[in-house]
Structures are given as C-alpha cells and as structure tokens.
C-alpha cells in the first residue's frame, strides 16, 4: 500500500471493511444452508422455513454483489435439490 497517497490509504481501509462484511454474509449463508439440510435430513417440520431463510440470504447477497447472480442461483438450486432428496429419503 502506498503510504504517501491518502486516497489509497482510504481505499485500503474500505476494502478491509467490505471484505469483513462480505465474509460474514457468506458465512451466514453457509450456516443457514447447512442447518436447513440437516433439518430436512432429520425430518424436522421447519426445514422449509429454514430453506426459505437461506434462499433469502442468498438473494440479498446477490443483490448487493457479494455473490454473482449465477452463483446465487446455483447455490439455491443445489440446496433445493439436496433438501428435496433428503425429504424423499425420509418418506421412503
């Protein structure tokens, strides 16, 4: 980082803040996705609500450009597929 340029110092500070915020959002998405999947595998009734919460967080991250829109769609699709598979296994 260039120590002589105030604007470069400020941009660096801002990038560190954004990185922390983005990492926290991605971590929350992973946590809620895992909780939804575990709930579906365990046959919990609130698995659908957890899935909706995870998908909402994914959409918000994509809206704020933390995630690319295609990456968000892929995560939602894979989560739904895994949860549906777990629910089908519970019923069988």
Swiss-Prot record:
Signal peptide: none annotated. One of its GO terms (cellular component) is small ribosomal subunit. Keywords: Ribonucleoprotein, Ribosomal protein, RNA-binding, rRNA-binding. Transmembrane segments: none annotated. GO terms for molecular function: small ribosomal subunit rRNA binding; structural constituent of ribosome. Residues 1-25, 68-92 are annotated as: Disordered. Residues 80-92 have a biased composition (Low complexity). One of its GO terms (biological process) is translation. SUPFAM superfamilies: Ribosomal protein S20. PANTHER family: 30S RIBOSOMAL PROTEIN S20, SMALL RIBOSOMAL SUBUNIT PROTEIN BS20C. Belongs to the bacterial ribosomal protein bS20 family. HAMAP family: Ribosomal_bS20. Binds directly to 16S ribosomal RNA. This is Small ribosomal subunit protein bS20.
């Amino acid at each position: 980082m260039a120590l002589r340029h105030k604007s470069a110092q400020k941009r660096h500070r801002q990038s560190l803040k954004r990185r922390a915020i983005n990492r926290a959002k991605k971590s929350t998405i992973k946590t809620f996705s895992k909780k939804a999947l575990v709930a579906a595998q365990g046959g919990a009734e609130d698995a659908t609500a957890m899935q909706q919460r995870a998908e909402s967080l994914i959409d918000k991250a994509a809206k704020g450009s933390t995630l690319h829109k295609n990456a968000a769609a892929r995560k939602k699709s894979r989560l739904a597929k895994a949860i549906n598979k777990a629910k089908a296994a519970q019923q069988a």
